[in-house]
Amino acid sequence: MNQTENKPKNYTGIVLTLTVLINGLIAVLFFMPKLDQFSHANIHILPMLNAIFNSFTFIFLLAALIMIKQKNIKAHKRFILAAFTTTLLFLICYVTYHSIAENTLYGGEGIMRPIYFFILITHICLSAIIVPLALFTLIRGFSMQVERHKKIARWTMPLWLYVSLTGVIVYLMISPYY
């Protein structure tokens, strides 16, 4: 058997391309004109769906963490795939909503205003970072690069948990202003 058969495939190009496409699409959504042909549709349920998807992502990630601590790799993988699924559903709803609806401005005052913006800004920044981290972590786990997977997962898991939880918090804080 030659060495190229044992060497894991390099998915860096795919991960970086997906990262640029996903983060680029989300950035463009805030500057592009909204799609008028759907203005009659009741899309205000989509932010709540996003919060629900984020909630499930958070729960699935916690379950995956518990499963791996218990050395239940099979269940860990299933919960991670469930988290990726709810994250993908979130992304579809998020892009749909923000391609149609105008941005909602936060109307809170006092101490809640800086708290909201701190949570929002950290959520946005870490959301962009979590895209490649989650993809690389998934690839390393499923390609059985166990040590490399563990090394990156120590960063990915807490950041992804934070992003999914703060997504729900941001929704709860801004929902009165929809």
Swiss-Prot record:
Its main location: membrane. InterPro entries: DUF420. It is a multi-pass membrane protein. One of its GO terms (cellular component) is plasma membrane. The keyword Cell membrane applies. It comes from the Bacteria. The chain crosses the membrane at residues 13-33, 48-68, 80-100, 115-135, 155-175. The keyword Methyltransferase does not apply. Keywords: Cell membrane, Membrane, Transmembrane, Transmembrane helix. It is found in: Cell membrane. PANTHER family: DUF420 DOMAIN-CONTAINING PROTEIN, HYPOTHETICAL MEMBRANE SPANNING PROTEIN. This is Uncharacterized membrane protein YozB.
